[in-house]
Amino acid sequence: MINAINLPISLNNGPPAGGFGLNTNIFEINIINLGIVIGLLVYLGEGVLTNLLVNRKQTILSTIRDAEERYREATDKLKQARARLQQAKVKAGEIRSNGLARMEREKQDLINAADEDSKRLEESKNSTIRFEEQRAIEQVRQQVSRLALERVLESLKSRFNSELHSRMIDYHIDLIKSMEGTTD
């Protein structure tokens, strides 16, 4: 009946006398061999496995800390960028409003300059018109005076005869003599 149970331990296939060995055939392993192997793995591998797990844990924690630090830095940079953007918007608004105000001032200055130029041109035109009027009036006066003198001369020529001429000469001679007598 022993043959019917088929135990995985074979007496013929064992190690030579005086030695210890493990059966590496997985289908022929018994529970004791399996317990010994697992016990050795746990005993010998515990320190290595613990070190691996501790190192892995430290690496993960370091990576998490680095990620959190980068997140904080990115958040700070984002806040700074938003603040700079806001400042840029404010500055752009100031520049835009200053530009509009300057444009309005320059527009008003141009309008005022055009008005002043227009007034100066009007005054110059009026001055030129007055000057031309005065010149025309002066020319008319001169022509009237010349014509009046010409008429007077013509009337004097027609009335002036030799007797009147002699009396005028005598009158002026007497006038000169009386002036000489008063100066001596």
Swiss-Prot record:
Recorded GO cellular component terms are: chloroplast thylakoid membrane; proton-transporting ATP synthase complex
- TM ranges are 29-49
Arranged from A to Z, the UniProt key words for this protein are: ATP synthesis, CF(0), Chloroplast, Hydrogen ion transport, Ion transport, Membrane, Plastid, Thylakoid, Transmembrane, Transmembrane helix, Transport
Cited Pfam families: ATP-synt_B
Keyword Coiled coil part of the UniProt annotation: no
Q: How does it sit in the membrane?
A: Single-pass membrane protein
Q: Where in the cell is the protein located?
A: Plastid, Chloroplast thylakoid membrane
What family does the database annotate? Answer: Belongs to the ATPase B chain family.
NCBIfam families noted in UniProt: PRK07352.1
> What is the designated name of this protein?
ATP synthase subunit b, chloroplastic
Species this chain originates from: Psilotum nudum
- Gene from which the chain derives: atpF
